[in-house]
Amino acid sequence: MKKIYLIMILFFATASGVFAQTTNIVTLMLKAKSGEAEAQNALGEAYYDGKGVTENLTEAVKWFTKAAEQENAKAQYNLGICYYYGYGVQYKDYGEAVKWYTKAAEQEYAEAQNSLGYCYEFGEGVDKNLKEAVKWYTKAAEQGLPMAQCNLGVCYKYGNGVEKNLEETIKWYTKAANQEYAQAQYYLGKAYDKGDG
């Protein structure tokens, strides 16, 4: 008898969770269809991750685009990611990715600033420009984004777009490492091992 009660409790707990999730998606869809940019981006993320709906990258791009065109920085960044990797679009398009990263980066969206810096560093979708890469990495790093802090540290280590400066290298690696960013922790350990720190 206890097994039956336990099974019923588990069933209803699961069913109520599914019901709540379905209700949230329906509400999100209604808001997105009414033109709310944040809801459009959130719905795009739901389709991208397959949370509450079946994963559908084409639908994700559709909703990211609607929100991005309303100047939603997170959606612009998400759309840039889709074009960069070719998710939900016909093919990878670095130029289109840079366009959307730039729009989000100009709104101080740190992840987009870092991604834009990466594109400039490696000449993906834009002409290679190390000074421009450093500019965008710095903006994101100053906002506390550990990946950008690590990338900026690498630029200072090798003199990419800035004058070589081991003190700055260690400073930025340390900031990223203190946020548990594994790559920066590795680089910092290597620097101390070589006596650079």
Task: Give the positions of each predicted feature.
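Short helix-capping/linker turns of helical repeat alpha-solenoids
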Residues: 33-36, 49-51, 56, 69-72, ...
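Alpha-solenoid helical repeat scaffolds
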Residues: 29-30, 58, 65, 95, ...
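Cleavable N-terminal signal peptides
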Residues: 7-8, 18, 29
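Sec-dependent N-terminal signal peptides
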Residues: 4-14
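Hydrophobic face of amphipathic alpha-helices that form TPR/SEL1-like repeat modules
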Residues: 42-49, 78-85, 90, 115-122, ...
